[in-house]
């Protein structure tokens, strides 16, 4: 029994993203609209094929609209948005589609380079599709859904949104619907377990992917050699050495890799930043014009900074970044090392080392 208790104490609770929360509230409101039912929970589909059962409630009617809400659950991630209520109000329309809009409490994009145009509400394409897919399990067309976040504007002031160019509320995000506790120190044990599985299949190369998007595209290139590491770049290198791998390849989006290029082997924001400084330096080395460098310096995010460059210029800059990241990794590891930079849509932007 003691052994089981010790094992249970190491398990981590996963959470749900704001996108999944909004999808659950939206599905509940449409069930209320179409069927006049008020379930206590709903199940929603996710982009990775899993289904999530999420508590819903707070049903109400507002003229011809039917409303319901769900609360975000962040699991064991420290998150200011834990418990945040997202309200969805739905109504009938003459449209042959399902329309999703965001109202008070959802932020507005004010800078280029983010997932949407300037002036749009900050709902990522994947999260929006997840909401639509959830609603389609009730009705295929002819409804609209409006999203409200009562405390969104207030809480967003304490998030990264104002720093990246989203004003007036939170963002509705999520690539999988599930929030993984990837920045917790205990997650290193999970990394070790995943790496052991890769090692047991006979692979001598371990591929590291910080997040969901990089993991997805890295799997398309390297198959089952890939593990997800969150912010733990340095610790993952040590794990690879301890387990006897001969090569490690880091596959990352630009936002994480510029931190590694700056010498950060744990990329969590509590340990530092230096993203735009690194991007600016790399742009100078790559020969980018002064006019564009001045725009990069004033950017609020890596995505915005890169949006001012042509495709060719982005590749040149990312080559500098990947070379510097490789240099930093070589300082702490004697393994054969490689770095691959990929874009949000999975295109390879640059490579360095042995990949």
Curated annotation (Swiss-Prot):
Per the record, the domain of life is Archaea
Top EC category: transferase
Gene Ontology terms describing biological process: anaerobic cobalamin biosynthetic process; methylation
Under which EC number(s) is this enzyme classified?
A: 2.1.1.195
Could you tell me what reaction this enzyme catalyses?
Answer: Co-precorrin-5B + S-adenosyl-L-methionine = Co-precorrin-6A + S-adenosyl-L-homocysteine
Q: Signal sequence span per UniProt?
A: none
Its annotated pathway reads: Cofactor biosynthesis; adenosylcobalamin biosynthesis; cob(II)yrinate a,c-diamide from sirohydrochlorin (anaerobic route): step 6/10
- UniProt keyword annotation of Transferase present: yes
Keywords from the named record: Cobalamin biosynthesis, Methyltransferase, S-adenosyl-L-methionine, Transferase
Q: Name one GO molecular function term.
A: cobalt-precorrin-5B C1-methyltransferase activity
Query: Which NCBIfam families does the entry link to?
Result: cbiD
Annotated family: Belongs to the CbiD family.
Name recorded for this polypeptide: Cobalt-precorrin-5B C(1)-methyltransferase
Which species is listed as the source?
A: Sulfolobus acidocaldarius (strain ATCC 33909 / DSM 639 / JCM 8929 / NBRC 15157 / NCIMB 11770)
